[in-house]
Structures are given as structure tokens and as C-alpha cells.
UniProtKB/Swiss-Prot annotation:
This is Mediator of RNA polymerase II transcription subunit 8. Gene3D superfamilies: 1.20.58.1710, 6.10.250.2610. It is found in: Nucleus. Keywords: Activator, Coiled coil, Nucleus, Transcription, Transcription regulation. Belongs to the Mediator complex subunit 8 family. One of its GO terms (cellular component) is mediator complex. It comes from Aspergillus oryzae (strain ATCC 42149 / RIB 40) (Yellow koji mold). InterPro entries: Mediatior_Med8_fun/met. Transmembrane segments: none annotated. The keyword Transcription applies. Residues 6-30 form a coiled coil. Component of the Mediator complex. One of its GO terms (molecular function) is transcription coregulator activity. Component of the Mediator complex, a coactivator involved in the regulated transcription of nearly all RNA polymerase II-dependent genes. Mediator functions as a bridge to convey information from gene-specific regulatory proteins to the basal RNA polymerase II transcription machinery. Mediator is recruited to promoters by direct interactions with regulatory proteins and serves as a scaffold for the assembly of a functional preinitiation complex with RNA polymerase II and the general transcription factors.
Length: 244
């Protein structure tokens, strides 16, 4: 192969920089796990994991974009390379096989990818679209048949809570009577009692029980305690609201 051009050398330098960033972010995570007592907060770990994920994505995209160049390059030592003092580095540069552990990871990844491509039992795009149309409505209807937040499910209450084996030393109270009293005082509250897909066009239709006039008068608009932007940032990076 001819001497690399300046553009090719620039690509190699970019590869080196991305790999250095990935190595440093991994080393930072390992150091924080090994030396911190107690362990770092989950928000800190989430932030570090996000950085590592971004670095991995950057390396993957760069290697894919420059696949032809990187697969055609051949490394060899020049006459001026200090082979005696830098033997370990030279061995790594001239290595033609992956590390045994890495080779096993690559083999498993390729096997999993090939299995996914050969799987003919998967759903077609039309079937997936139909599934996603069906799932939200069915999940909503199933959720409304459950007793969320209680000690017993509706099925367990119907067959008798005294027959339920919980495996707990303490006895769980049946909150059914209390919830019935609460429901009597909340009959006039607005409640979504059903959901279904619209007959024409996209979207859903909800069946809503009307609220009383007194309830309408008492309703007041309340500003959210945490802005939506901070909530999304907290979900993706782990950063606490109000902190950047």
C-alpha cells in the first residue's frame, strides 16, 4: 500500500481520539466504582453510563464510515521504531488476532446477529403495525380491571382474601371497605371509564364520567412542580432537577 495521504492520516487521528475518549470514560467509571465508599449515587452512574454510550456510538459510527480505509491499512515498524524498548506496543500493533476474550464476544455477537436475520418466525411490518394499534387499547382495558395500589387483586378479593397465601408473617388488611366508603364520596368526580380507538383517523376516544358543578368550581389550574424539560433531562441523564 502506498504512503497514507493527509486525509487518511486525519481519519486515523480521529479514530485515535475517539478511542482515547472511550478508554478514559471507562477508566473513570471503573475508578469511581473501585474507590468510592459508599458507591457513587445512581444519578452519577447514570451520567457516566450516558457518556460511555455516546462515546461507543461515536466510535461505531466512525469505524463504519471509514470501514474501507481501516480494513485496507497494514501496520509495520519503520527503521527508526525503537523495537527493543517498545516491544509490547509493537506486539499489539502487529497483532493479527483478537484477544481471546474479545474474540469470544465478537463470535457471540455475530451469532446473535445471524440468528436474528435468519429468524423467519418474526412479525412482518404490517403485523407489527396491527399489534401496536391493538396493544394500547387492550392494555388500558386490562389495567382498569385491576385493583392498583391495594393489598389484594380483584380476583383474590372475589374468591375471598382469607384464602390467599401471601407468605408474609404479618396479616394484610383488606382495604375494600375503606375504598367503598371513599368511592361514595367521590361519585361526582370526573373519571375516565373507557378508551377505544377512533373509527376514522388516528387517535383514541375516551369515555368520561361527568363531574358535578361544585367540582368544576373547585378545580384550579396548578403549575407543574417540575418543568417537563427537567423531567426529560432527569430521565435521560440522571441530573437532578434544577442542576445542569
Amino acid at each position: 500500500m502506498a504512503t497514507p495521504t493527509q486525509e487518511q492520516l486525519k481519519t486515523l487521528e480521529q479514530s485515535r481520539q475517539r478511542l482515547v475518549q472511550l478508554t478514559r470514560s471507562l477508566a473513570s467509571l471503573i475508578t469511581s466504582l473501585n474507590q468510592s465508599d459508599p458507591l457513587p449515587s445512581w444519578s452519577s452512574l447514570q451520567s457516566q453510563a450516558s457518556i460511555i454510550s455516546n462515546n461507543l456510538l461515536s466510535v461505531s459510527d466512525h469505524l463504519s464510515d471509514n470501514r474501507d480505509l481501516l480494513t485496507s491499512l497494514v501496520a509495520y515498524p519503520g527503521p527508526d521504531y525503537p523495537g527493543r524498548t517498545q516491544a509490547n506496543t509493537l506486539e499489539q500493533l502487529l497483532r493479527t488476532k483478537l484477544d481471546p476474550r474479545v474474540e469470544d464476544w465478537v463470535a457471540r455477537g455475530r451469532k446473535a446477529g445471524a440468528s436474528a436475520l435468519e429468524d423467519k418466525s418474526g412479525l412482518a411490518e404490517a403485523e407489527l403495525a396491527e399489534l401496536w394499534d391493538w396493544a394500547p387499547v387492550e392494555a388500558n382495558q386490562e389495567a382498569r380491571r385491576r385493583n392498583w395500589g391495594g393489598n389484594f387483586t380483584l380476583e383474590e378479593r372475589e374468591m375471598g382474601v382469607q384464602n390467599v397465601v401471601t407468605g408474609l408473617a404479618r396479616v394484610l388488611e383488606d382495604e375494600g371497605s375503606e375504598s367503598e366508603d371513599e368511592e361514595e364520596g367521590e361519585e361526582d368526580e370526573m373519571e375516565i371509564v373507557g378508551v377505544r380507538r377512533q373509527s376514522a383517523g388516528a387517535g383514541f376516544e375516551f369515555d368520561i364520567a361527568p363531574a358535578s358543578a361544585a367540582q368544576h368550581q373547585q378545580q384550579k389550574f396548578v403549575e407543574p412542580a417540575v418543568p417537563l424539560e427537567d423531567i426529560l433531562r432527569f430521565m435521560t441523564t440522571g441530573a437532578e432537577p434544577g442542576k445542569r
